[in-house]
Amino acid sequence: MLRVAVPNKGTLSEPATEILAEAGYRRRTDSKDLTVIDPVNQVEFFFLRPKDIAIYVGSGELDFGITGRDLVGDSDAPVRERLALGFGSSSFRYAGPAGRDWKIADLAGKRIATAYPNLVRKDLAERGIEATVIRLDGAVEISVQLGVADAIADVVGSGRTLSLHNLVAFGEPLCDSEAVLIESDRGGQDDTQAARDQLVARIQGVVFGQQYLMLDYDCPRAVLDKATAITPGLESPTIAPLADADWVAIRALVPRRGVNEIMDELAAIGAKAILASDIRFCRF
C-alpha cells in the first residue's frame, strides 16, 4: 500500500485534497482525521504539517508528499520533485525597511530573521555573504520593528503584509515556490511501482486539465498552415474536412493562460466559430 503525505492545514491543504479527489482518491470526511485509507486504490494518506512533509518523505517512511517547493528546499531532505501542481504560487525574498535602496550585498554583517534558515544560509553562502540568520517560526515581519533583526527573508505573495510593516522586498527571489509532488530519493519497492506510476499519472492528468483548454474552430483551408502554427496542439492538431471543401475543422489543446490572445490571432486570419472548452483530465 502506498503512503502519501498531504498538508493538514494552511493554503496548500484544500487544493491538494481537491486534486487527489479529482484523481479518484478517497477524501477525508473529518478535518481532524490524521490518516485516511483508500482500500480501492491501495493508498494510505497521512495529513501532516506542510513543513514536516519533506522530512517524512525523505526518510523513506512515506512514498510521496504534497508540499511547497520552498519548504522542500529548506528541509535539505533527500527527495526529488515529480510534479509542479500549479497552485500555492509565491516568491521567497529578502525584505528590509522601506526608504533605503537595498541591495543583496547590504546584508553582509546584518541580522536576517526567517522561518527558512537553511534556505537563507545556502543562498548567502553561494553569494559569499556573511550574516547572522535568526530562526523565527512566525510573524517574521515584526522582527525588524522589534529590533530583533535588520532584514527578513520570507514568502511574499501580494506584498501587502510587507507594506503594513513598512518593509520592501529587494533582490531576485531566492526561490519561486508552488505546491509540488515529491518522492523519496530512496526509491520505492518493486511491488508498489505500478501504484506509484498510476498516482503520478492521475495527478498529472488533473493538473493538465486545469492548465489547458480544448479549442475547436473552423478555418479557411487557405490559411491552414498559419492556423496550425498558432495552435500546434501537443503532438499535432486534429484536422477534419467540412462540407465546404474550402474549409476545415480544427481541434487542439491550448494553454488556458493566453487563450484569449490565441483566439484573437485565429480570428484575425479568418477562423470562425472559435470555441474553448474545459477539460477535466488528460493522460499522455
Swiss-Prot record:
Cofactor(s) the protein needs: Mg(2+)
Gene field: hisG
Swiss-Prot/TrEMBL catalytic activity: 1-(5-phospho-beta-D-ribosyl)-ATP + diphosphate = 5-phospho-alpha-D-ribose 1-diphosphate + ATP
Localization terms from the record: Cytoplasm
Function field: Catalyzes the condensation of ATP and 5-phosphoribose 1-diphosphate to form N'-(5'-phosphoribosyl)-ATP (PR-ATP). Has a crucial role in the pathway because the rate of histidine biosynthesis seems to be controlled primarily by regulation of HisG enzymatic activity.
Originating organism: Mycolicibacterium paratuberculosis (strain ATCC BAA-968 / K-10)
NCBIfam families: hisG, HisG_C-term
Protein name: ATP phosphoribosyltransferase
EC number(s) per entry: 2.4.2.17
Subunit organization: Equilibrium between an active dimeric form, an inactive hexameric form and higher aggregates. Interconversion between the various forms is largely reversible and is influenced by the natural substrates and inhibitors of the enzyme.
Stated regulation of activity: Feedback inhibited by histidine.
Stored HAMAP family: HisG_Long
Primary residence: cytoplasm
Gene3D superfamilies: 3.30.70.120, Periplasmic binding protein-like II
Keyword annotations of the record: Amino-acid biosynthesis, ATP-binding, Cytoplasm, Glycosyltransferase, Histidine biosynthesis, Magnesium, Metal-binding, Nucleotide-binding, Transferase
InterPro entries attached to this UniProt entry: ATP-PRT_HisG_long, ATP_PRibTrfase_cat, ATP_PRibTrfase_CS, ATP_PRibTrfase_HisG, HisG_C, N-reg_PII-like_a/b, N-reg_PII/ATP_PRibTrfase_C
Cleaved signal peptide residues: none
One of the record's GO cellular component terms: cytoplasm
Pathway: Amino-acid biosynthesis; L-histidine biosynthesis; L-histidine from 5-phospho-alpha-D-ribose 1-diphosphate: step 1/9
Family statement: Belongs to the ATP phosphoribosyltransferase family. Long subfamily.
UniProt keyword Phosphoprotein present: no
